[in-house]
């Protein structure tokens, strides 16, 4: 994350805001992001602010618009996908959130994206739990079960 901060200490509000967001203190983060000068707002910071708006103010339309704008400005940063997905989740759009997380993983396999997608996935139990998931027997029987049930 050090690439988005100025070396002369001007990025401290941004650093503290991102840290507060990741620790779950979105109210403090939103307050910190509102103090950041518009010229210092990168797409990443804008996406974090959008997530804070969604969780604290419940203004989902504004948060989605802001996060989508951030993604359009920088499609290469996986944390922007993470924050857009979080906004979709907060708004109740689970399917859109999972699609966004998957797009972010295609961009870069970031651990936070992987963890979030894994926590949302809804895989069924394996037919033969004593075998590995990749075992052909589990795969074939699993596919048969999915067509029957």
Segments the model singles out, each with a brief description of its role:
Residues 14-22, 27-79:
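Alpha-helical adaptor scaffolds
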